[in-house]
């Protein structure tokens, strides 16, 4: 596991900026991603029949990704990948649990009594991209995650929030099949454009020690 730390330089006075964010990258094990990619694409039409997600103002939302409403992304509130009856998904769930536990140990964070997950998937076709967005800043925000199922020369960029005006800085995470990324869920992120004829398929999720909505299911 590779741990990435966005951290300020030592402060020289009480008013200089400070930050200390963590994320990590690791490789999943024992998952057939070719089978999983086909399964998710075959399921796409069914997912698109679900209601579109809604924001706090009760308006349709794609999670601020700008992927649009004709997408699985925009149904993120109304299905949970972890409920799919699929062997590769079962193995993926265990990989997520293992990565979560290892990450907490690596950064010295306490383990929660319970862990809940909201999980969806994104399909980007040629010319599409996910715009800059974040998953939340409320007091219960915890960890977000991302698993690359299928990709061809794309990346996800995680921004260092305090430094985005004069000299914007970000961490580029290349989308490699099987890579699992965990990050503090208030870290804003985006992708570059998919220029390939093949779909960029990723599974994304929110983790929480508490059940934030009916769409969250308990995994620990």
Functional labels for PLM-detected ranges:
Residues 108-187, 192, 199-202, 210-217:
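Catalytic core of non-heme Fe(II) oxygenases with the double-stranded beta-helix
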Residues 53, 195-198, 220:
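Flexible domain-boundary/linker segments
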Residues 1-108:
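Non-heme Fe(II)/2-oxoglutarate
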